[in-house]
Amino acid sequence: FQIFMLKRTSQAAFASGMFVFPGGRVDGDDHLHKYDRYRVGPSQEQAPQVEALGYEWRGFWIAALRETFEEAGLILAYDSAGEMVSLASDKDYTRFQEYREPLHRHKLSLLEICQTENLKLAVDRVHFYNRFVTPVGRPRRFDTRFFIASAPEEQRGRHDEMETVESIWITPQEALKLHEQKEFGLMNVTRIQLEKLALFPDKHSLIAMAENQRHFLIRRPNLPPPE
């Protein structure tokens, strides 16, 4: 199976030139209860994920869906017929791509897109996986929740040409091999996640794990003390 990765611009203040997963910070609007009318899930089977995420679970899930569309152009949502949005037609693809820049510039919200397009966000298809916290002592620290989802078959994704300048579907094994050859820049946390993903033989086993996971890794690595 392949995963979608983005190359950050060399002008970025953080992880410049590195290949990363789609993602970003949680915005205040991501916590709004107004989204409850425009989402499906979390399902009963996802109750352990809700518990692991804590009282801010809504914001984390909405942020994951918003950033996936904003950065990668992948919209994980159901249309008015209850089918996953496909963007198979050029007209639909172009219309949705035109939402991305105003969304990035905070001139448009994901909630407004859902209202305009009559969408319900597919929270039930996006699964909390694990959490990584940057070690104390680093100049920039992050507390990151990682999610796993299967992209709709008809959607291919594309970088935003602002924060990211390249995009690629690639197997975890190939990404790790290219990284070893100094041809595919990765942060340590991304490399570790790829090593975990590479253990799964196919997409179905990976998604099955994500759907049924009951214990969630929280990794807080420590830096060696200064000499």
Predicted regions and their residues:
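N-terminal leader/linker segments that precede catalytic domains of diphosphate-processing enzymes
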Residues: 1-227
